[in-house]
Amino acid sequence: MKFKNMFSPIQIGPMTVKNRFVVPPMGNNFANSDGTWSDESVAYYGERAKGQFGLITIEATVVHKGAKGGPKKPCLYDDNSIESLKKITDACHEEGAKVSIQLQNAGPEGNAKNAGAPIQAATAIASADGRDIPEEVSTEKVYELAKGYGEAAERAMKGGADAVEIHMAHGYLVNSFMSPRTNKRVDEFGGNFENRMRFSRLIIEEVKKKTEGKIAVLARINSTEDMFGGLDNHDMCAVASYLEDCGIDGLHVSRAVHLKDEYMWAPTGIHGGFSAELVANIKKCVSIPVITVGRYTEPQFAEQIIKMGNADLVAFGRQSLADPHTPQKAMEERLEDLTPCIACLQGCVANMYAGKPICCLVNPVLGHEKEGLPKAEKAKKVYVIGGGVAGMCAAFTAKRRGHDVTLFEATDKLGGNMRLAAYPPGKGDITGMIRSYIVKCEKAGVNIKMNTKVTAQMLKEDTPDAVILATGAETLVLPFIKGIENPDIVYGVDCLEGTRPIGHKVLVVGGGMVGAETADFLAEQGHEVAIIEMRDAIGPDVIHEHRIFLMEAFEKYGIKQITSAAVSEIFSDGVSYKNAADKSDETIYEVRGFDTVVLSMGFSSRYTHRDGQNVVYDFAEELKDIVPEVHMVGDAVRARRALDATKEAYEVALNL
């Protein structure tokens, strides 16, 4: 077997896990508002058990009434949720998976409005600007809170859980006691290391007492807080050793607090296993099993981690969202079939914070596992025009439902603009996602025709039953900007693909995600780069965690930023612009002297043009009298996030 270490069993306390693949706890907002788990929750976890994950950890579950961090958080502070939990554990056990459940009090990272009560922490220090200031927990209350963890663990056991995981990381309640950065107490729970760890010890004692050694007890900890004055990796080694002495059966090692959530969520550009060395240091300090987590997507790297003895199990967090059958495919050595997480954070982290059910750019089935993929009532001849990710998603889904599907691509490469999105620094993983879609289409039997431009006449002759227009978008060219048609101007897509020569000194026009990443791409190559944007900041549409690293690159390469600048004319060597922040300022400003001007103001639909306020879908309108069903998906409708494109493509294919 290729991954013999990853598929070997392991003992964690009284629990035997069949392999080393772990689903870590991830907020998903699938739970009901009353704190019970929904049927969607059952199907979601059950699907990952079918995919042969050995240990599945249920998301952070509230252990104290008045500590609910969000409207869709499951709760175990009373018996109300035991029955729904049993449905999840039964579904997972049926597939041979073990189930752990994370026990959490959000503490200072909570929300008083959602909780219906003041939030609490070791000390009355807000976790960040704009967050609620917590109440300092009284000495007597600390003992009461510890008992709450024990009672919740007992309920988890009654619900069929094989283990509980006490959340001691990421700045939540327990972590707020543990860290000298947030614990300023002078009672028996503050001051020296032993006192700051006392709350953790009390919790472990209560959980052990209530569960009587029948289930495993794990703790989730940080490898480092990544904060000045906080717990560093050296400190966390001592914490890990202390927790083992307290009787913990295993450790799940994550990283950082929310003020450094770029290391919690690890966006595109952060490599898989970015905290592996820190976890390895902790592993050296304990004799109990250690789970490592941190943007793992590929089994090869996980196998190496186990082989080297740097951890005992590997958690595939967002990868389990992207492809719930990752272990099964690894077992069968179908590695090209893996759908990799690209760490875009668009549907998982963004929705989690917004209180919406999570979804996934590369896996539109996420959150819809309960519905399944129904066979088509009648097989149709379906033409999908456009081989970007939306087109491939629609084609693959329609083919799986039993339709006769042909996918047309006008160029010699599949992937559309998403393929170009892989060119900027740190975005190379996107190619893996595109390749996985190509393989899916090929293996499903989609008829793929490259270098083929579809015409209305062709459709008249071929008589398909349905056409899905997934023709994507092209560079946005705003006609009111004088000189924008100048042939010397290089489009960002041409710059990325290397189809136009680029001079040393470059001005990028457009500071959204496309322009900002193009500027980063050029600066890394050694170009002297400036960027101009109408809004008051560069990259305001870039996911927060990714933008942090993007702006670090801007500083590293000395990229000059011109903001609040409404470009009025483009020249071969620069632009003129007005002050967009002050309409009363009629001054015309200029920046000149560049070797190349790159236009990266975003994209617009290929088959859309605007006449005043009216949007006309030219090709779609033309086809309505030719084809019984015409659908448009993704950027063909309007330029949007890839998340919206794949979701829309899946839904259209589902309803053919």
Question: Model-flagged regions — what are they?
Answer:
Residues 323, 328-329, 520-531, 643-656:
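Internal hydrophobic alpha-helix adjacent to the cofactor/substrate pocket in enzyme cavities
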Residues 403-417, 527-538:
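Glycine-rich FAD pyrophosphate-binding loop
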Residues 1-385, 389-400, 404-405, 413:
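Flavin-dependent oxidoreductase catalytic cores
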Residues 431-476, 484-504, 524-619:
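A Rossmann-like FAD-binding core segment of flavoenzymes
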Residues 387-400, 503-527:
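Rossmann-like NAD(P)H-binding beta-loop-alpha module
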Residues 518, 542-543, 609, 633-656:
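A conserved FAD-binding loop/helix module that cradles the flavin
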Residues 32, 66, 174, 227, ...:
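Glycine/Thr-rich phosphate-binding loops of Rossmann-like dinucleotide-binding domains
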